[in-house]
A protein has these predicted regions:
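Short, hydrophobic beta-strand segments
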Residues: 114, 186-191, 232-236, 247-257, ...
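Single-stranded RNA-binding regions, centering on S1/OB-family and related RNA-binding modules
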Residues: 549-553, 560-722
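Glycine-rich, flexible beta-strand/loop modules in the N-terminal catalytic cores of phosphate-handling
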Residues: 25-111, 116-123, 182, 189, ...
């Protein structure tokens, strides 16, 4: 039976329906907004035992079918392949608000498949993916404490826009995806153009109002088609095991919790875990993993209690303190820009590389094919946390962290017209104990300034945490990895001294009240200013020039109608320039030209060459030209590529000239002055006036018409008159 609900959201109709598609799944919902349609199906191992993993084994796969935009996939096989970066980020966006809404003891394998089935090329699918996945879980029998709503918030011309279109986002001052329950925000992610804290919080308030409507719509669908929820009865641990582990571990856990550095602490925890598991092996075989979970709970309880009781964290800091910071730039001699940013036991080596137009990344999406001239790649090798990890390409986490840092930095980059370089920033995390993505933001800002990229202002980032018990709470600044793990919130906030450029928040509790968020944002701002002070103490502004090893790029415009003349038949002209100068030349349809190369003199030569090909003759200007043809009445001289003018025999010399060949020959290079461009565009030149700047144009008797066979490129020229 088909069940359907609908409402107005942001001036467009939002509809949800179930009962027609994928009826054998645990829950399936189709969401339509405009002409964009997303379908999500959720399923779980209903009859299998809970997973033995120490985490909730939920996977989300968001895919944008190319047929949704009326396209056929490229490549040899002509079918969808590995998920694109946008799809991976969409999968993470769906996963993050849903994961904390399941009970800890529910560990059955759960899968969410979301598909973009139709795209109107204006409304993006990720938001609908969150809605449809949430609705699918809400109508299923699974113990999901949702539903959740999701909206995108923009700000254009002083007004907030709910679910701005792709076109509107191009001029929007912010782009935030916000998810939550009726009265609490659970997840947010996005970017902004240095907005104030007040504007950010207003956006969250508006988002909350719209989220409530979306949640109520899903609740209406649940009333029509929802199944009764089952109660999770499985225990996490065998009877008596938790008490036995606590008895053996509790005396030492308090000591371990304040042990540093991280590696020493981790080794001590592992040794204790193995020892206790060995002691309990007779009664509880293969129990080491569960022993680790119980010890984890003990350390979490101790960490939180100490913060509430003493306002002291495991590393001795107060809740509002940031860790010691050290940063340096220019440490890699042949790179274009480099920085090492160290905050506590988190360390990022960040390198900026400048490239040319040909280095831009082509992004083939459902909406359109686009090009990216700024890329930030984040790498998290195993050794950064003392582990062994295979190299299989970037993980979803690495892609997500890189995207957050990229969005945060992108807001301060110069426009292409002012700095026509392709920029790639790579952040290699060398050590990690919390907030490596924000260390990447700080390091990227420093590396870009070291590379001479004229960014508007430095950007810094900090991760905020939270511990909350009932009405009691404590906000933590610059959290450690353990505080992220044991705490209730991970709020990453990046920005300049002016305002916020990037934000991401994930909660492990049911939601976050507006008052708490406002306080966390203010604390993050204070920390960000302190970090910027430290960064600017090392390098306060971009270097005056780019690295000597970076390519030189000159950008200028030529008339669109001259593009063909520059390229030449079959690319003949442009190839000649490339071969002679060793440069790269990119010409866009709008007439913009990018000339790049590693040898400045060759770049200048190529620029002058191209400009000369489109230059028009100018009366009064002296040119260095080549004699191309000789007639009985004068000589034709090429003063610009493809542009000839006539030096009449009377203008070859102050003396009387009997034969043109007595003064010039074909192939001679001579200086000539442009004296006239007639109504037909023909150029008249004078060698005599170029040789003698004081010479005046003299009157000559009228001359006879030239023979038609000796004319110009049109095989003839009307009579020359003085």
């Amino acid at each position: 039976m088909l069940h359907k609900v609908e409402m107005d959201l942001g001036g467009r109709k939002l509809s949800m329906e179930t009962g027609l598609l994928a009826k054998q799944s645990s829950g399936a919902v189709l969401v339509r907004y405009g002409d964009t349609v997303v379908f999500s199906a959720v399923s779980y191992n209903r009859y299998a035992k809970s997973s033995e993993a120490d985490y909730f084994p939920m996977t989300v796969d968001y895919r944008e079918q190319t047929y949704a935009g009326g396209k056929i996939p490229g490549g040899f096989f002509k079918r969808e392949g590995r998920p694109r970066e946008k799809e991976i980020l969409g999968s993470r966006m769906i996963d993050r608000p849903l994961r904390p809404l399941f009970p800890e003891s529910f560990r059955k394998n759960l899968q969410i498949n979301s598909y973009l089935l139709s795209s109107d090329l204006e409304n993006e699918g990720e938001i609908l993916g969150i809605m449809s996945a949430s609705a699918g879980l809400a109508i299923s029998e699974m113990p999901f404490s949702g539903p959740v709503g999701a909206v995108r918030i923009g700000h254009i011309d002083g007004k907030f826009i709910v679910n701005p279109t792709i076109t509107q986002l191009e001029t929007s001052a912010m782009n935030f995806v916000v998810c939550g329950k009726k009265d609490q925000i659970i997840m947010l992610e996005g970017e902004a153009r240095e907005i104030s804290n007040e504007l950010f919080l207003q956006a969250m308030e508006i988002a909350q109002v719209e989220i409530r409507k979306v949640v109520e719509l899903q609740e209406e669908l649940v009333k029509q088609a929802g199944l009764p929820k089952f109660v999770v009865t499985e225990q996490l641990y065998p009877e008596g095991m938790e008490a036995a582990v606590k008895e053996k571990a509790l005396p030492d856990v308090l000591k371990l919790n304040v042990m540093s550095p991280k590696l020493v602490r981790s080794m001590a925890i592992q040794e204790m875990q193995s020892r206790i598991a060995t002691e309990l092996h007779g009664k509880y075989p293969d129990c080491e993993r569960k022993v680790g979970e119980i010890m984890d709970d003990l350390m979490s309880a101790d960490t939180r209690a100490r913060i509430f009781r003493d306002r002291i964290r495991s590393d001795g800091r107060k809740p509002e303190d940031i860790r010691p910071i050290a940063t340096e730039v220019g440490l890699l001699p042949r790179t274009h820009g480099s920085a090492l940013f160290t905050r506590g036991e988190t360390q990022a080596l960040v390198v900026a590389t400048l490239g040319t137009k040909s280095d831009e990344q082509i992004v083939d999406g459902i909406e359109r094919e686009d090009k990216k001239s700024f890329m930030l790649h984040y790498n998290f090798p195993g050794f950064s946390v003392g582990e062994v990890k295979g190299s299989r390409g970037p993980s979803r986490r690495e892609i997500g962290h890189g995207a957050l840092a990229e969005r945060s930095i992108e807001q301060v980059l110069p426009k292409d017209a002012n700095f026509p370089y392709t920029i790639r920033v790579v952040s290699d995390i060398l050590e990690s104990n919390g907030s490596s993505s924000m260390a990447t933001v700080c390091g990227a800002s420093m590396a870009l300034m070291d590379a001479g990229v004229p960014i508007k202002s430095p950007v810094a980032g900090v991760a905020m945490g939270l511990v909350k018990e009932g009405d009691k709470y404590e906000i933590l600044t610059d959290i450690l990895g353990a505080e992220d793990h044991f705490g209730d919130m991970d709020l990453k906030l990046a920005g300049t001294r002016v305002g916020i450029t990037g934000a991401q928040m994930d909660l492990k509790v049911a939601g976050l009240e507006h008052k708490l968020m406002a306080e966390a944002i203010e604390r993050a701002t204070q920390a960000r200013i302190k970090i910027l002070d430290i960064m600017e103490g090392v390098l306060a502004k971009p270097r005056d020039s780019i690295s000597q090893y970076a390519p030189r790029i000159v950008m200028f415009m030529i008339p669109k109608e001259k593009i063909g003349a520059v390229i030449g038949p079959g690319g003949k002209n442009i190839r000649k320039i490339l071969e002679a100068t060793g440069t790269e030349i990119d010409i866009e349809d709008d007439g913009s030209v990018h000339v790049s190369g590693t040898v400045p003199d060759m770049v200048e030569k190529a620029v002058a060459w191209v400009k000369s090909m489109v230059e028009e003759a100018e009366v009064g200007k002296i040119y260095d030209g080549e004699v191309t043809r000789i007639m009985n009445f004068g000589a034709f001289v090429e003063i610009l590529p493809g542009k000839e003018g006539l030096v009449h025999i009377s203008e070859l010399s102050d003396e009387r000239v009997g034969r043109v060949e007595d003064v010039v020959k074909i192939g001679d290079r001579i200086k000539v002055k442009c004296t006239e461009i007639d109504d037909m565009g023909r150029v008249n030149l004078s060698k005599r006036m170029a040789d003698n700047p004081n010479a005046e144009r003299r009157a000559e008797p009228r001359r006879e018409a030239r023979p038609r066979s000796g004319g110009d490129r049109r095989n003839g020229r009307p009579p020359y008159r003085r």
